[in-house]
């Protein structure tokens, strides 16, 4: 069965996978808007330091590194987080550089999970989940795998950029898109009037020859 076709032989619609990407982008956009509020910036460093205080001794060095790195420039990192989340959200919604966006978002989500969320804190008393950022990373990985099998997204900026820029697929797709094949045209038989007919003289000669051989 050809790829992209359902069991009935009809091509699977493109909009469900694009709707998933856009819906997830809207969730990220809401989260990004909250990051631009003053409350996030004012409590940013307190959150990082609070996460460090509850970590076991074997992980203390990891959180000390991030606290020491960000503490002198906490406002810069707070704005950086808000900007990165905004860029990811916009790229998701419009479908821009999907392979690059998904890959960068996986790394960013894992970094948030390993710092601001303290690996979800499954080893701390009273922990009830492993954090949300790791779930975001899994969703981005799913979108990346889906793009590999589904190919170019019809409702995305990448779809049109790939037509204009020959190398754009390298940052938008996991593999080079296969050019669409032109539909095969059925062979139409020529009308009988156009089929060459033997000349009358040749037909007569053939008849005489057959009579002489008898």
Model regions: which residues?
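Extended, low-polarity transmembrane helix blocks
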Residues: 1-84, 94-214
């Amino acid at each position: 069965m050809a790829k992209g076709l359902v069991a009935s032989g009809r091509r699977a619609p493109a909009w469900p996978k694009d709707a998933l990407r856009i819906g997830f982008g809207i969730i990220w956009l809401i989260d990004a808007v909250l990051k631009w509020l003053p409350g996030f910036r004012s409590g940013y460093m307190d959150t990082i330091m609070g996460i460090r205080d509850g970590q076991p001794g074997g992980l203390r060095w990891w959180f000390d590194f991030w606290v020491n790195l960000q503490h002198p420039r906490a406002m810069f990192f707070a704005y950086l987080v808000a900007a990165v989340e905004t860029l990811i959200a916009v790229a998701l919604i419009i479908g821009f550089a999907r392979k690059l966006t998904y890959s960068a978002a996986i790394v960013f989500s894992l970094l948030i999970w390993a710092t601001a969320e303290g690996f979800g804190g499954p080893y701390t008393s009273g922990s009830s989940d492993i954090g949300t950022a790791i779930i975001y990373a899994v969703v981005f990985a799913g979108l990346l795998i889906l793009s590999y099998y589904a190919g170019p997204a019809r409702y995305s900026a990448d779809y049109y950029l790939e037509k204009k820029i020959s190398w754009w697929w390298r940052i938008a797709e996991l593999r080079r898109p296969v050019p669409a094949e032109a539909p095969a045209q059925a062979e139409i038989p020529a009308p009988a009037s156009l089929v060459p007919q033997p000349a009358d003289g040749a037909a007569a000669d053939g008849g005489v020859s057959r009579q002489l051989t008898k």
